[in-house]
Structure formats: C-alpha cells, structure tokens
A protein has these predicted regions:
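N-terminal post-signal-peptidase region of extra-cytosolic proteins
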Residues: 56-61, 76-80, 107-114
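Gly/Gly-Pro-rich "capping" loops immediately C-terminal to redox-active cysteine motifs
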Residues: 65-69, 83-119, 143
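Electrostatic cytochrome c docking/interface patches
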Residues: 38-71
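Stable alpha-helical elements in mature extracytoplasmic
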Residues: 64, 71-74, 89, 121-124, ...
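The canonical Cys-X-X-Cys-His
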Residues: 68, 72-81, 155-159
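Sec-dependent bacterial lipoprotein signal peptides
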Residues: 1-19
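Bacterial signal peptide processing site
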Residues: 21-25
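C-terminal capping alpha-helices of c-type cytochrome domains
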Residues: 121-167
Length: 167
C-alpha cells in the first residue's frame, strides 16, 4: 500500500496543475472566445430533425442523415455546428443556409470568398462541397471536394438539419 502513495500524490499534483492551466468558462462564455456568446439552443430531438428534413427539397429530403453525420466527421476538424460555437480553422456553420458567403463575424475569410457574392443555398452548397476551389478560385478552404452526388446530398441534409433552429 505504501508503494501506491507516491503514485496517488503524483496524480493529485498533476490534476491540480492541469486545473490551474486555464480560466474556466463561465455561463454564456467560452474559454477561447474572450467574451460572452449567445446561449445555445437545446439539441434537436430525432422527431424535430425528421420534421426539418421532411421540409427539404429532393434529394435532401430522402438523404441518409446518418451517412451525412459520418461524412461530417471530415469537416469536424475545422468546423463546428452548434449555435454560438467557436470558429476554428474554418468558421462555425450554424445558420449557414440562406446566409451570404463570409457571414461569420470575426472569421478571417479569403478575399475571394468575401467578394464572391454567394448565398449559401442548396445548389451553391452542393457546388462548394463538390469542388470549393473551382467555385471560388482563391479560397483558403483546403478541402479538395466530394465527387459523389449521393454523399453530397447526405452531408448537405445533415448540415441543414443540424444548423437550423427548431421551429
């Protein structure tokens, strides 16, 4: 038992050291934002997601949301989806549909995207995900694109359902 005491002491000191590394975020504040963020909406229920998807045009209405979620795993390293979420390498995607390109305040977009005049509708999002550098030459987005129309439809349906407030 006495051999365990040094390990326990080291574990406690490590936990205390890690706890002191950063200031925890307070209510409505994110640690990396430097300020207050809007309160996020509660996650959508499966029924709310199904209702949102039922309102989408084809091929998004019949797209596989689970497949879209799996495809989003590629996007997750650069983008967040939740309301009030942080921008990372790429901007937060909450509220994308219907917004003008380069709409996230404070995100460092390329001049090409800022001046593109694009609005994020289904057709534009499809072209963007297929070949972003072809749609907007000079974009900073390093993603090479997604060839499969079925995969793009699944991803776009997932993004639309998960970046739109519940009704």
């Amino acid at each position: 038992m006495s051999a365990d005491r040094p390990l326990i002491a080291i574990a406690i000191m490590a936990a205390i050291s890690l706890a002191a590394c950063g200031k925890p975020a307070t209510d409505g504040e994110t640690a990396d934002s430097g300020g207050v963020q809007p309160a996020a909406s509660p996650p959508l229920t499966d029924a709310q997601k199904a209702a949102l998807q039922a309102e989408l045009p084809e091929p998004y209405r019949s797209a596989d949301l689970e497949k879209g979620e799996a495809l989003y795993a590629m996007c997750r390293s650069c983008h967040t989806l939740v309301e009030g979420g942080a921008s990372m390498t790429g901007p937060n995607l909450w509220g994308t549909f219907g917004a003008k390109a380069a709409y996230v305040t404070g995100f460092n977009y390329s001049d090409a995207l800022k001046t593109s005049g694009l609005t994020w509708d289904f057709a534009t999002m499809d072209k963007w995900i297929e070949k972003p550098r072809e749609l907007v030459p000079g974009t900073k987005m390093s993603y090479v694109g997604m060839k499969s129309p079925e995969d793009r439809a699944a991803l776009i349906a997932f993004l639309k359902v998960n970046t739109t407030p519940a009704k």
